[in-house]
Amino acid sequence: MTENITTETRPSIYGLTRDQLIEWAIENGEKKFRATQVWDWLYRKRVQSFEEMSNLSAVFIDKLNEAFILNPLEQVVVQESADGTVKYLFMLPDKVMIETVLMRQSYGLSVCVTTQVGCNMGCTFCASGILKKERDVTAGEIVSQIMLVQKYFDERGLDERVSHVVVMGIGEPFDNYEHLMNFLRVINDDNGLAIGARHITVSTCGFMPAKIKEFAHDNLQINLAISLHAPNNELRTSLMRITRNAPLEKLFEAIDYYTETTNRRVTYEYIMLSGENDSPEIAQQLADLIKSRNKLSYVNLIPYNPVAEHIKYERSTKDNTAKFYDVLKKNGINCVVRQEHGTDIDAACGQLRSKQIKKNKAKLA
């Protein structure tokens, strides 16, 4: 069962898939085509209220208003980077806050969404886990992040649309699986936002390997990324406490099951921490771990964005990163050093939210 997670009793209509919206409409005495009209208003015309749906009856609009809200998020802070990255801080109906990031890529507009308010995974280098999980983010609230970013461009008369989505914001997506899957089905719907499945990536730390197997059977063509960050259990446990319950042996058994079932590539995210996990010896361990799986593997080396609360960690030097990369390439591993975005704003995941919460507490003191 999903926990009671908002003070607003009406859910966001964005949380319904098209089939669920049709089912709701029929149950409420409306024809199927009326639900299709609502869907078109939501995702093609992208209206901001039910009253703008001009081909619906007043009675049907009243039904919609009684049952749903449209967009449950309120924009609190917007930070724009010199490189075009935009970071948003949104407030939810129960006054908790989440982050969303827009990144301009050579291939289009990519949005990084948040799936939980806070995080309990306990990664020692990450800003997201500084503030523990308060609740899950509903499917409607996740979709709303995309809609508000798109609104940002629509209002400016810019002919640009969100083309890619990465589920890599605050929280562990597979710890909010039901809402995650509804969100994915909504944004992937060909009659709506029509964001291609292969343009969507979901990242997990692997805290529940069984969820990776379940994801394989849900049979979406969505990309899977694994937050790996270390090639052995001892080092990974020191960085990610979830390794105690999900050691690499269990994690890779699930990953192997996923690739055998789907024949889809897995991306391994590896954050580069100076003096912790960035030596050539550790690079060789990573290569040995991935080598037999290399046909369906890709390693993403990520420059670390320092976090004030985690002063122990510093980003690897460019020289050490290059040496690490070279070891992987010499072993035939598919890899890349990730392009940085938003380095002149609160770039690390969770940083902006943490800073705003501290500011709010200071005002109340």
From Swiss-Prot:
Subcellular localization: Cytoplasm
Binding site for S-adenosyl-L-methionine: G171, E172, S203, S227, L228, H229, N305
Enzyme Commission (EC) number: 2.1.1.192
Top EC class of this enzyme: transferase
GO molecular function: 4 iron, 4 sulfur cluster binding; metal ion binding; rRNA (adenine(2503)-C2-)-methyltransferase activity; rRNA binding; tRNA (adenine(37)-C2)-methyltransferase activity; tRNA binding
Gene Ontology cellular component terms for the protein in this record: cytoplasm
Stored PANTHER family: 23S RRNA METHYLTRANSFERASE (PTHR30544), RADICAL SAM CORE DOMAIN-CONTAINING PROTEIN (PTHR30544:SF5)
Misc remark: Reaction proceeds by a ping-pong mechanism involving intermediate methylation of a conserved cysteine residue.
Protein name per UniProt: Probable dual-specificity RNA methyltransferase RlmN
Species this protein is from: Lactococcus lactis subsp. cremoris (strain MG1363)
Primary gene name: rlmN
